[in-house]
């Protein structure tokens, strides 16, 4: 039986569905837009059904397109998996590893982990993707990422199909300017009510990390909506700089402020009788083939945790 599609056509359909644009899909796949359009027309002709809606320069999948995309993603994932299996047989402990991480982890924690892993296993090629927890989890489910460490909430419809393991606790620290009166106290400890007298700098309200911090605060009887938020920024780095310049206070991950603590550009204060933590998780797809490179990285993560305890 001759199949009415090629793997490249499946990749093109997936890219269009992801990018929602012929132009951006062509850029991602490093092909010309006319060539991409021709491939899609050929695919639709051979299948004898429309896969895409093209209205007012907006591209979306038809019902048939959505159904076919599900099978396309599974076919592509199996093809990539078969290549990894064969590569494992040929290379032994050598190979490729695709790691994912949510934003804060990917910026501050993962580089240290990967540096040690690369030192111990220089024969393994590592590719890293940093994005929101939702996007990383979706790519793990689709088989695009081998293993990931995330700190946000994973959507239930994705989480139920993943292997999710609690990894480490990440403490959320309250940082203030060194010139703030609280920083000049001998014991840098405040009570719960003091929080409502601070000027806060936060991430944008639609940020996954901001929502996570707010939810944790609500669970331990804080009312973040009553905080005096004077500034919303789009990155942890910008927030740390603003705090160091004396503009306000902020909650940040403990892993994000090691440099600032060493340089003494900010001050940490504790909240009496309260410790705010979140759980970082290791996620993988139990249905995907697990290469030797993934096993080595997985074991390295747990070794690092056990040696740091």
Curated annotation (Swiss-Prot):
Xref: InterPro entries: LysR_subst-bd (IPR005119), Tscrpt_reg_HTH_LysR (IPR000847), WH-like_DNA-bd_sf (IPR036388), WH_DNA-bd_sf (IPR036390)
Q: Which GO terms describe its molecular function?
A: DNA-binding transcription factor activity; transcription cis-regulatory region binding
Q: Does the keyword Transcription apply?
A: yes
Q: Name one Pfam family in it.
A: HTH_1
Output the CDD domains linked to this UniProt entry.
PBP2_CysL_like (cd08420)
SUPFAM superfamilies, sorted: Periplasmic binding protein-like II (SSF53850), Winged helix' DNA-binding domain (SSF46785)
Primary localization class, coarse: plastid
Q: Which domain of life is it from?
A: Eukaryota
Q: Which UniProt keywords apply?
A: Chloroplast, DNA-binding, Plastid, Transcription, Transcription regulation
Q: Which residues bind DNA?
A: 22-41
Q: Which residues form the HTH lysR-type domain?
A: 5-62
Compartment(s):
Plastid, Chloroplast
Which GO cellular component terms, listed alphabetically, does the Swiss-Prot or TrEMBL entry include?
A: chloroplast
Q: From the record, what ranges are coiled-coil?
A: none
The function of this protein is: Trans-acting transcriptional regulator of RuBisCO genes (rbcL and rbcS) expression.
Similarity section: Belongs to the LysR transcriptional regulatory family.
The name on file for this protein is: Probable RuBisCO transcriptional regulator
Q: What are the leading ranks of the lineage?
A: Eukaryota, Sar, Stramenopiles, Ochrophyta, Bacillariophyta
